[in-house]
């Protein structure tokens, strides 16, 4: 009932922020406070320390990379709404016969799974429409409606992949408008791409160091932008993944991030954090502890920090930026770092930091969206 009534029906109809409509998700809950998240983490450690923490699976409607870019999109909600209105105004003829919710889904999907080609977007929109069972369905296919979805997908991907100096699509929009809406959509795609990567890396590091057992779906050592089955079952390029892990062994997080080698950034977070877990099993098992850490200052609401303890002593600290769009004054935002001597294992040139004091988050987050610290004085 849950799968067919909610996840495979209602979740394809409620599309204000499509990434909330995930398997096991609660679309009505837009966010959690950091305090609520900390309480949840403590509860998991106490009652389900071996629970699986999945990011992407064979059945997710959007991979973790797509969802992170959707969260970045939500950070610029007003600009996104204006861009969508402009796009609707300029594409009346193109979207004739397609309901507004599905058009909104197409725009969100193109923006958060970009780059995506017309065939993939068409397949996704058709599957989504059939699951929604409003205008077409698996048992009663409406060929005209699905053809309209294909035209929409083709026009949208052409616009987003075209030359910005040539009205994006190389020609006026379907009703002769000047393409301002398409330009606005593309601008937001460009603005939220890197913040989306940052949020994905932050989410990954949190998952790898939280109570529970983190699961890494096949091929997700690199950024993937897969959609619902069967898109998320495509065989990964294993040679490329092996080469990526080898590259990550020669780089650290800040270096890969500075050079926009974001796949290497993700591989660095995975390989180094898993190595830390192997060195510090007592900090992650059933007898480990979880301690929220206080963040203070001008952007305290934009970061999250916690410690994992072994034998009641903090030995691992995770610090992550949880909002990524716009400027951040990390120098004026501090963490109450526990006693001890600490080093960020995601950065090779990081100097040891003394705890027992408030330390500016700029120490780490000015260079990389996340830090995973290990205690040295043991």
Tell what function each PLM region has.
Residues 1-378:
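Carbohydrate-interacting/catalytic domains
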